């Protein structure tokens, strides 16, 4: 009789699981499914990726190294051929590789919150402009947007030029030199972001800047370790088993940013003591402020932000302004070395518009360098600094294609794959700056190219980044040819917080005569 009751109970359980599985992906730890309103199979819009275990896609990344994590998404994109669905550890994930879906998500009012993976960055960046949401994000965005106004960028240009010239001093007296870009470019971009956005020169803090970069790499290593192991997704388990080196690296980078803030406070102290009202009609600092950090310090005086908030934004701006821009420059110089004909076109354009003494190298002159801009845009198409972006549905949300995302669903926008989608790009693996000529852009989907994101959460520093990259390219190409020093076929990409390679990229500089 007991056996009969057990059989009946098991049968009832299996029947219930079968019924429940229509709404939940049971084996993926009761994940609420993505569905269509009329109940038709969701696969007609977005195929479901088969996991390598019975637990959906939960363990698909387990045990993969950095290259394996990166290649997983590339393999999935090729296999599925369109945007697709995964079920991972209690969460539905909508993976986007087409421009239409990207446009819908990046402009959807319900999809402003960053995805859960960004929570792994909270110990580092806390909830600054990159990771915050809701009213806090709106307030910080409104506060910081004026600090990247074109009038402010014009003031930064002299710093970009000076830092670019200082960058070349390390090669003085050398007619030929092979350089490792990952060793020299990040130092340049860190110096630039600290002097422009923070108002602090790193000349006397060079060693501390190097330690910052080293420990940033350690933070990134921990981020990938956590991403690829579901057992470490919970904060408690991560803190118990894998956070020791993470904590020490955090201490170094936070002490560095705190010292930057303290130095700038000292420089502004006299002015703050003497100042009267510095806010505009909206209660925010005047657009005439020189540095972003100045804006934050004055906003603190007016009660609009506290010290922790300043730390959040400084850590965020230093990360985004130093790391993502350095990646653009590294791959930009690599592409110069691999495409000598394109490099020559850039050089001839520079010679036509820019004097050799660089005394008049201002934003107006940079804006004349159209082909150089196309070159850098093509670089960021093939090698976007941020290859994926994430969003979370904080409430049930219907997309334009009919998919209904349950509350808590994750959305991953695969920028790397959208940028190489043959639907939008002819011979997508080929490097062709001419793709960005006006006549070639006008009929292309606007969201087929989103290296700086798009919509209401687009990157406020995209003009800053392009201006900095173009300035260094001008100063360098005036003096050097950039020659090939690596085999591009041997490049192995890694997943990081941003786009990485297994081996450091090198180029050869040959002085022009």
From Swiss-Prot:
Its EC number is 1.14.-.-. It is a peripheral membrane protein. One of its GO terms (cellular component) is endoplasmic reticulum membrane. Transmembrane segments: none annotated. Its main location: endoplasmic reticulum. Keywords: Endoplasmic reticulum, Heme, Iron, Membrane, Metal-binding, Microsome, Monooxygenase, Oxidoreductase. It holds the Pfam family p450. It is an enzyme of class 1 (oxidoreductase). Heme binds at residues 320, 459. Its cofactor is heme. It is found in: Endoplasmic reticulum membrane; Microsome membrane. One of its GO terms (molecular function) is heme binding. Belongs to the cytochrome P450 family. May be involved in the metabolism of insect hormones and in the breakdown of synthetic insecticides. This is Cytochrome P450 4p1. It comes from Drosophila melanogaster.
């Amino acid at each position: 009789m007991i056996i009969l009751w057990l059989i009946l109970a098991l049968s009832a359980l299996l029947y219930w699981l079968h019924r429940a599985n229509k709404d939940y992906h049971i084996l993926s730890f009761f994940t609420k499914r993505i569905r269509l309103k009329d109940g038709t199979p969701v696969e007609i819009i977005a195929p479901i990726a088969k996991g390598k275990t019975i637990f959906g896609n939960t363990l698909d990344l387990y045990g993969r190294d950095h290259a394996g994590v990166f290649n997983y998404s590339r393999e999935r994109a090729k296999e599925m051929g369109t945007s697709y669905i995964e079920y991972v550890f209690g969460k539905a994930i909508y993976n986007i590789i087409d421009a239409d879906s990207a446009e819908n998500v990046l402009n959807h009012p319900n999809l402003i919150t960053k995805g859960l993976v960004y929570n792994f960055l909270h110990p580092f960046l806390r909830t600054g402009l990159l990771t915050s949401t809701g009213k806090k994000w709106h307030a910080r965005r409104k506060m910081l947007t004026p600090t990247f106004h074109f009038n402010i960028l014009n003031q930064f240009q002299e710093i970009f030029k000076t830092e670019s010239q200082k960058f070349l001093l390390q090669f003085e007296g050398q007619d030929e030199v092979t350089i490792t870009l990952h060793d020299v470019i990040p130092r340049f971009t860190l110096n630039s972001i600290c002097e422009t956005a923070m108002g602090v020169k790193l000349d006397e803090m060079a060693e501390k800047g190097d330690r910052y970069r080293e420990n940033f790499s350690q933070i990134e290593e921990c981020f990938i370790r956590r991403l690829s192991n579901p057992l470490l997704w919970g904060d408690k388990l991560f803190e118990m088993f894998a956070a020791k080196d993470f904590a020490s690296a955090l201490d170094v980078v936070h002490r560095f940013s705190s010292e930057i803030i303290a130095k700038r406070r000292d420089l502004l102290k006299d002015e703050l003591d003497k100042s009267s009202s510095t806010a505009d009609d909206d209660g925010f600092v005047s657009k005439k402020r020189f540095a972003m950090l100045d804006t934050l310090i004055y906003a603190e005086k007016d009660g609009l932000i506290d010290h922790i908030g300043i730390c959040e934004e400084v850590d965020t701006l230093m990360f985004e302004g130093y790391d993502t821009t350095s990646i653009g420059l590294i791959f930009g110089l690599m592409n110069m070395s691999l495409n000598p004909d394109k490099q020559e076109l850039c050089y001839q354009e520079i010679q036509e518009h820019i004097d050799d003494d660089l005394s008049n190298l201002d934003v107006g002159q940079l804006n004349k360098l159209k082909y150089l801009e196309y070159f850098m845009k093509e670089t960021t198409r093939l090698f976007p600094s941020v290859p994926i972006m994430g969003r979370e549905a904080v409430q049930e949300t219907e997309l334009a294609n009919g998919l209904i995302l349950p509350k808590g669903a994750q959305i991953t926008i695969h920028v790397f794959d959208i940028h190489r989608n043959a639907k939008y790009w002819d011979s997508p693996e080929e490097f062709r700056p001419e793709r960005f000529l006006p006549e070639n852009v006008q009929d292309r989907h606007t969201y087929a190219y989103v290296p700086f994101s798009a919509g209401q959460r687009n990157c406020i520093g995209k003009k800053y980044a392009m201006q900095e990259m173009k300035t260094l390219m001008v100063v360098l190409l005036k003096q050097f040819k950039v020659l090939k020093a690596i085999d591009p076929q041997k490049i192995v990409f890694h997943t990081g917080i941003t786009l990485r390679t297994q081996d450091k990229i090198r180029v050869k500089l040959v002085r022009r005569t």
